[in-house]
């Protein structure tokens, strides 16, 4: 059993129940609603590399993305050799037919989709953006090529050792996230621009996938590679975690500051002191909670509203103190307070970072995926590789979440 992901509104989730078979389950009421089976794969169609990959925890048999609760899903079977891993199918689950098939030059790593756009990430660090209404290719973004062009313009040549590292897969993977709103705000990680010799993926690009134009560029959101990324439903917030996994940061995707302040850091939380591989994060529909899960026995839930109120109180007290000292005019107080409320958290020492508001204890020997349902506030869905689907309530006062119900699949 291998859980893949929830859809955009957490009304369904997908899982691999047996080889070459992918199942979609409805969350409320809980039950199986679709099963996709592929023909039996012969030994000739699965090469050694693919079989080795399939045994690892990092490689799913399928890459899937559902379109809310509609009958359309995008699916790639990565368990049938490298040729199949380059083919993406759009499937109608009601008719059990393939609507269209797309073939890419490299293996498909991830798919994100909403009602307007589908974005496909390849192992070559390329992002293909499609109009979902007609499956027309609108744009191709090459993250690695952009970095290599920068290196050429700066040094006049590209180091072969850099290209070699990329081909050998020694660098971290590009991460992508697309908001479920029709605005289609796409966020993806990019190679560090401030250090042209660095091939760390710790920059963040905010891209308008509806109008095909860049919106914002966030430099060095973490010291190390960004290992996990998620975006709010409305596309206004993006959350990041590095490969170390101790700090979680949330940024504004748009540049709304009237003062030049660099990255728009909204929130910063400490997940823990020990390193952790965070593999999924979710922001709830109201933008109050952020949940993250990794290779530990705890799912952390952070309260963004609570920290925002604390930041406002801190900025108000600091701006008032400055006024008393005669360092600010009354006219500039509101502007400065607004600026400070957005940036003050970056000045707080690490040891004072807020930790989780609520948590869920889980089995750290299995993988879990998260969902915040649109129709139920203060509720979290957890689907796990051990075949359990759990519904949890977030307590108003915080602390350990309350298990509401549990189902087996």
From Swiss-Prot:
<keyword id="KW-0472">Membrane</keyword>
<feature type="short sequence motif" description="L/FRRG motif">
    <location>
        <begin position="269"/>
        <end position="273"/>
    </location>
</feature>
<dbReference type="GO" id="GO:0061723">
    <property type="term" value="P:glycophagy"/>
</dbReference>
<feature type="repeat" description="WD 4">
    <location>
        <begin position="361"/>
        <end position="402"/>
    </location>
</feature>
<dbReference type="GO" id="GO:0044804">
    <property type="term" value="P:nucleophagy"/>
</dbReference>
<dbReference type="GO" id="GO:0000422">
    <property type="term" value="P:autophagy of mitochondrion"/>
</dbReference>
<dbReference type="GO" id="GO:0016050">
    <property type="term" value="P:vesicle organization"/>
</dbReference>
<keyword id="KW-0813">Transport</keyword>
<keyword id="KW-0853">WD repeat</keyword>
<feature type="repeat" description="WD 1">
    <location>
        <begin position="1"/>
        <end position="35"/>
    </location>
</feature>
<dbReference type="InterPro" id="IPR015943">
    <property type="entry name" value="WD40/YVTN_repeat-like_dom_sf"/>
</dbReference>
<dbReference type="GO" id="GO:0005829">
    <property type="term" value="C:cytosol"/>
</dbReference>
<dbReference type="GO" id="GO:0034727">
    <property type="term" value="P:piecemeal microautophagy of the nucleus"/>
</dbReference>
<keyword id="KW-0677">Repeat</keyword>
<dbReference type="GO" id="GO:0034497">
    <property type="term" value="P:protein localization to phagophore assembly site"/>
</dbReference>
<keyword id="KW-0072">Autophagy</keyword>
<dbReference type="GO" id="GO:0030674">
    <property type="term" value="F:protein-macromolecule adaptor activity"/>
</dbReference>
<dbReference type="GO" id="GO:0080025">
    <property type="term" value="F:phosphatidylinositol-3,5-bisphosphate binding"/>
</dbReference>
<keyword id="KW-0963">Cytoplasm</keyword>
<dbReference type="GO" id="GO:0005768">
    <property type="term" value="C:endosome"/>
</dbReference>
<keyword id="KW-0926">Vacuole</keyword>
<dbReference type="InterPro" id="IPR048720">
    <property type="entry name" value="PROPPIN"/>
</dbReference>
<dbReference type="GO" id="GO:0034045">
    <property type="term" value="C:phagophore assembly site membrane"/>
</dbReference>
<dbReference type="GO" id="GO:0000425">
    <property type="term" value="P:pexophagy"/>
</dbReference>
<feature type="repeat" description="WD 3">
    <location>
        <begin position="273"/>
        <end position="312"/>
    </location>
</feature>
<dbReference type="GO" id="GO:0070273">
    <property type="term" value="F:phosphatidylinositol-4-phosphate binding"/>
</dbReference>
<comment type="function">
    <text>Required for cytoplasm to vacuole transport (Cvt) vesicles formation and mitophagy. Involved in binding of phosphatidylethanolamine to ATG8 and in recruitment of ATG8 and ATG5 to the pre-autophagosomal structure. Protects ATG8 from ARG4-mediated cleavage.</text>
</comment>
<dbReference type="InterPro" id="IPR001680">
    <property type="entry name" value="WD40_rpt"/>
</dbReference>
<dbReference type="GO" id="GO:0032258">
    <property type="term" value="P:cytoplasm to vacuole targeting by the Cvt pathway"/>
</dbReference>
<dbReference type="GO" id="GO:0032266">
    <property type="term" value="F:phosphatidylinositol-3-phosphate binding"/>
</dbReference>
<comment type="similarity">
    <text>Belongs to the WD repeat PROPPIN family.</text>
</comment>
<keyword id="KW-0653">Protein transport</keyword>
<protein>
    <recommendedName>
        <fullName>Autophagy-related protein 21</fullName>
    </recommendedName>
</protein>
<dbReference type="InterPro" id="IPR036322">
    <property type="entry name" value="WD40_repeat_dom_sf"/>
</dbReference>
<dbReference type="GO" id="GO:0000329">
    <property type="term" value="C:fungal-type vacuole membrane"/>
</dbReference>
<dbReference type="Pfam" id="PF21032">
    <property type="entry name" value="PROPPIN"/>
</dbReference>
<feature type="repeat" description="WD 2">
    <location>
        <begin position="221"/>
        <end position="261"/>
    </location>
</feature>
